[in-house]
Swiss-Prot record:
This is Acetate kinase EutQ. It comes from Escherichia coli (strain K12). Its EC number is 2.7.2.1. GO terms for molecular function: acetate kinase activity. Pathway: Amine and polyamine degradation; ethanolamine degradation. The lineage of its organism: Bacteria, Pseudomonadati, Pseudomonadota, Gammaproteobacteria, Enterobacterales. Belongs to the EutQ cupin-like family. GO terms for biological process: ethanolamine catabolic process; generation of precursor metabolites and energy. It comes from the Bacteria. A bidirectional acetate kinase that may drive flux through the ethanolamine degradation pathway under anoxic conditions. It may generate ATP that can be used by other enzymes (EutA and EutT) in the eut pathway. Might serve as an assembly hub for bacterial microcompartment (BMC) shell proteins. It catalyses: acetate + ATP = acetyl phosphate + ADP. Homodimer. The keyword Transferase applies. It is an enzyme of class 2 (transferase).
Length: 233
């Protein structure tokens, strides 16, 4: 049976101080999540065995309308010896990959950041340290959100970062909000009109607005909301 190279294998190797791993494709299966984690950690996976054509280890492009499970299944089958695997083996490998992917996504979507709070409650957040959580109000889209200043800081306002790619979702604001776009474009649809703010622009959205937040490309912005408990209103 082929050895399955998982994201945990990459993490463990990286924790040992290793920067690269050589993998014999004829005897191994590298999960998509393992490759993703390797990219995030700057870890190099070297695929050995030049006797196997590149097309044997790199599956053909998959149409966008295929489900995620179909894409994972085809990736696994492409790395198994032709005619030498069973459906039960494929199902077993798919289950392991899906669990690994879910674990990776949950770990990757935990909000965090570094900050220093000085005398009198003055707080400085290290913007480069911010890791995004997932905004439940935008499901099923993957919208990142991290609160940086909240009522826990003794503030009557809240502030944080949001970011996502190529998605729109409806939202009703029961609070006032000001957004400053840091990257990309923020689109707000309201009463048949679309307002667009680009990097460096500031947008005000008054309380009571029923809108669609979105972007046709990508966006990252700083939001300031009043009152601080805007998510529970």
């Amino acid at each position: 049976m082929k050895k399955l190279i998982t994201a945990n294998d990459i993490r463990e190797a990286h924790a040992r101080g290793e920067q690269a791993m050589s993998v014999v494709l004829r005897a191994s299966i590298i999960t998509p999540e393992a490759r993703e984690v390797a990219d995030l950690l700057g870890f190099t996976i070297t695929e050995c065995d030049e006797s196997i054509p590149v097309t044997a280890s790199v599956p053909a492009s998959v149409p966008a309308d295929k489900t995620e499970s179909q894409r994972i299944r085809e990736t696994i089958i492409a790395q198994l010896p032709e005619g030498q695997f069973t459906e039960s083996l494929v199902a077993q490998l798919m289950e392991k990959v899906m669990k690994e992917k879910q674990s990776l996504e949950q770990g990757a979507m935990q909000p965090s950041f570094k900050s220093v709070t000085g005398k009198g409650g003055i707080k400085v957040i290290d913007g480069s340290s911010v890791k995004f959580g997932r905004f439940d109000g935008a499901e099923p889209h993957c919208v990142g959100l991290t609160d940086l200043v909240t009522g826990d800081d003794g503030s009557s306002m809240a502030a944080g970062f949001m970011q996502w790619e190529n998605a729109f979702f409806p939202w009703t604001l029961n609070y006032d909000e000001i957004d400053m776009v840091l990257e990309g474009e923020l689109h707000v649809r309201h009463e048949g009109q679309t307002m667009i703010a680009k990097a460096g622009d500031v947008m005000f959205i008054p309380k009571g607005s029923s809108i669609e937040f979105g972007t046709t490309s990508s966006v990252k912005f700083l939001y300031v909301a009043w009152p601080a408990n805007w998510q529970s209103l």
